[in-house]
Amino acid sequence: MKRFSEERGGGWEQHDLPNGGRASGAGSVELWVQRVVGVGILLGSLLTASGVTAPPPKEPVSEPRIGGLPLFADWPKDRRPAVTVVISGQTYGFLQPCGCTRPQLGGLERRAQFVQSLKAKGWPVVGVDLGDIYPQQMYVRQQGLLRYETIMHALQAMGYLAVGVGKTDIEAELDKLLTAYALQEERPPYLLAANLLGQVDGKVISRQERFQPAGLNRPLIDRFEVAKVGEVSVGIVGLIGRSLAEEIENNKLEPSITFVKNAQGKIDNGAVLQEVLLGLEQHPLRPQLLILLYQGSAEEAALLARDFPQFQVIVCRSEESEPPQFPTRSKNGSTLIVQVGHKGRYVGVVGAFPQRGGSWQLHYQLVPLTEYYLAPGSDAEALRNNPVLPLLQTYAERVRDRNLLEAVSKRPHPVQIQHPDLNLTYYGSHRCQNCHAADYLLWAKSAHSHALDTLEQKARRPNLRHFDPECVICHSVGLEYQSGFVSASKTPALKHVGCESCHGPGSGHATNPQHAGLQLLMSPWKQEAADRLPSLETMKKLASLPLVEQRQAEQALPISQRRTVERVASMCMKCHDHDNDPYFNLYVYWPKIAHGMKP
C-alpha cells in the first residue's frame, strides 16, 4: 500500500489480537535473530497487510503527494481546465473508513471535500462512476440496499452526471436497486449501459419496455447522457464489456436482461457503439468531450480505444485494489484508459485543456483520499458544511431503527458442523477464568475486552456504528454463528472480542476440559496437535526487526512454527485486514496479548 504524509494519532483505540499457543524452544533461532543483518527477499506471507511493520511517524496532515510530487504538478499553471472530470468506480458499498486504525484511505466524506476543493479553484467539475456501487457481500441484504441508495444520493450531492452498471449491481437484483434510487430520482446521476436489453421468457424486449416505468421521461438505465459542464458539452456512454456480459448470461445472474447481439447471436458491442456515436452526433448539445464507462478489462478497453478513437477517455475495471499511478494511452495516443482501484480509496481526475483545431490536451492525476480531505472543524460544523455527512448519519440511523443487527443470518460454526452431537454453543469469556485465570486477567486489561464500547463511544462521522452488523462482527463474539452475539441487551456475555472469537464456541471444552479432541478444536490454527507459535522472546525479537530482515529471520524458524504463524495471522486478518488495519503485523501485535505460553 502506498504511504502518504498523514496523521496517525487519535481516532479509535488500536485493537489487540487474540490467540492461543504454547511455548517452544527456539534458542538457536533466537540467537540467529540477534545476528541477522543485510537485505533479504520479501516473502508473500500473511504477517503484515501493508508491507511495513508500523504506521508512519505522527506528522501534520498535509496535502497528499504522488511520486514525491504535489497534485496537479504537471498541469498548466497559466489556465484552468475547460472541464475537470472526477472518476470513481468499483466502490463496492464502501461509505467511510472504519477508523479502527489510522491512517486509512477513502470514504465519501473525503471525496466530497476533494470535489469541493476543485470547485473552489474555479474549475468546472463533473463526476462519473464506473459502477459496482453495491457491496460484494453483506450480512444483511437490506443493508446493502441502504448503502447503494446512500452512495447514489452522495454522488448526486457531489455533482455526478452518470454511473455505469457493474456486476455487483446486477447480482443484487437490478430492479430493487432501481427502486431504491433511479425510480425516485429523475435527475443525475443517471444509470448507463448502452448494450442492455430486457428479456421475458426468452423473448428479447426493448430497453424502453424493460426500463421505462410509467410517468418517467427516460429509461431507468439509458445509453448515454450529455450535459454542459462550464462551456464544454460532455457526453458519457455506459457499456458492459463482452466478457462480463457473457458471464452474466452464462451464469444467469439476472434472467430478465440480455445484451445487443449480432445475427450469429454473439454480443456485439461494436454495433452498439456505432449507433450510440451516431446518436451523440445528432444530439442538440453536440458533445465535444466523450467518456466511455466500460465494464471490462484494460485489455478489452484498449481494443475499443483502437476501434473507436472518438472517445477521449475510457474508464475500465481494475483487477487490483490499488490503481496504477498513470493511465494507459491508446496506440494512436488520442484516448486515456483510466483505472481507479477499489472501494473509493482513490479518485482519478482528468483535466481537459482545449487546443487549436478543436482537439484536447488531457492531463491526469490519481488522488489518494487521505485524512487531508476530512471535513474541517467540529463534528457539528462538518455535518453542516460537507454535503455527504448528513446522508451518512441518516444511513446509520436507518440501520439502527430497522434493527439490522438482529437480522444477521446465523450459520453453524465449523466446529458445530464437525460435532453436531455435542450441541456446542458460545459461553462467554467470563466462563474461562476459573481454569485460565491469568489469561483471563490479561484479556480483561486488553482493548479486546471493551471492543464494542470503543465502537459505541469513539466511532463518528457517522456514529451509531455499534448497531451496524458490518462493524459489530469484529467487535463481538460469533455474530454470524449459531448461539453467537445478537445484541448488547440479549447476549451481554458475548459483547466485545472475547476468547471464543478465535477459539470458537467453548461449551464443550468448558464442560469437558480434558477431552483431547475438544482441546484441538479450540485451536483451529493448529494443523497438528504439537504446533506452537515461536516463544514470546522470539516474537518480540522478530517484531523489532525491519521488515526485510524480519522476513529473512523467520525463515530460520522451524517449519511447524512458520506454519502456525501464518495460520494464526490469517485468522487475525479476518478483522485486521488490509482495509481495517493496513499495518497489521503478528510479530508486533502478539506480544500485546500473548497468553497460553511461557515468556
Language-model region placement:
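Bacterial N-terminal signal peptides that target proteins for export
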Residues: 20, 25-37
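A short C-terminal boundary segment appended to hydrolase-like catalytic domains
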Residues: 79-81, 347-431
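Acidic, metal/ion-coordinating pockets
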Residues: 54-371
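Sequence context of c-type cytochrome heme-c attachment sites
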Residues: 389-566, 584-599
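Intrinsically disordered, glycine-rich low-complexity segments
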Residues: 7-14, 22, 26
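Bacterial N-terminal signal peptides
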Residues: 36-46
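N-terminal Sec signal peptide cleavage junction
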Residues: 50-52
